[in-house]
């Protein structure tokens, strides 16, 4: 059976997840955000940035609540970073 890839939804200092749209640029923004935080990969899932292999030291949620504050990813690069 396929092993679950560990990951989570990163949150800012107010414990807000990062909102995103299901556009290519936002998938890239989420990936760049995740890599900046020490994760290996990231994408937009249910309008929320999700990171794979996010270090335990990074504040994160394991699931999305129905009512949640959303942090913006405006300012995160939307092009592939080296």
Swiss-Prot record:
Disulfide bond entries: 16-69, 20-44, 30-49, 34-51
Keywords tagged on the record: Disulfide bond, Ion channel impairing toxin, Neurotoxin, Secreted, Toxin, Voltage-gated sodium channel impairing toxin
Organ and tissue specificity: Expressed by the venom gland.
Domain LCN-type CS-alpha/beta stretches: 6-70
GO molecular function: sodium channel inhibitor activity; toxin activity
GO biological process: defense response
GO CC entries: extracellular region
Location (main, coarse): secreted
Pfam families membership: Toxin_3
Keyword Mitochondrion: no
UniProt KW Secreted keyword: yes
Subcellular location: Secreted
Assigned protein family: Belongs to the long (4 C-C) scorpion toxin superfamily. Sodium channel inhibitor family.
Miscellaneous note of the record: Negative results: has no effect on Nav1.8/SCN10A sodium channel from the grasshopper mouse, a species pain-resistant to C.sculpturatus venom.
Domain notes from UniProt: Has the structural arrangement of an alpha-helix connected to antiparallel beta-sheets by disulfide bonds (CS-alpha/beta).
Function recorded in the entry: Probable sodium channel inhibitor.
Protein name, entry field: Toxin NaTx-13
């Amino acid at each position: 059976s396929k092993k679950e890839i560990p990951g989570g939804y990163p949150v800012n200092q107010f414990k807000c997840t990062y909102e995103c749209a299901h556009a290519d640029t936002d998938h890239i923004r989420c990936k760049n955000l995740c890599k900046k935080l020490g994760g290996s990969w990231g994408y937009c899932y249910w309008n929320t940035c999700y990171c794979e292999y996010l270090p335990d030291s990074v504040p994160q949620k394991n699931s999305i609540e129905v009512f949640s504050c959303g942090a913006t990813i405006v300012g995160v690069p939307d092009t592939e970073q080296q």
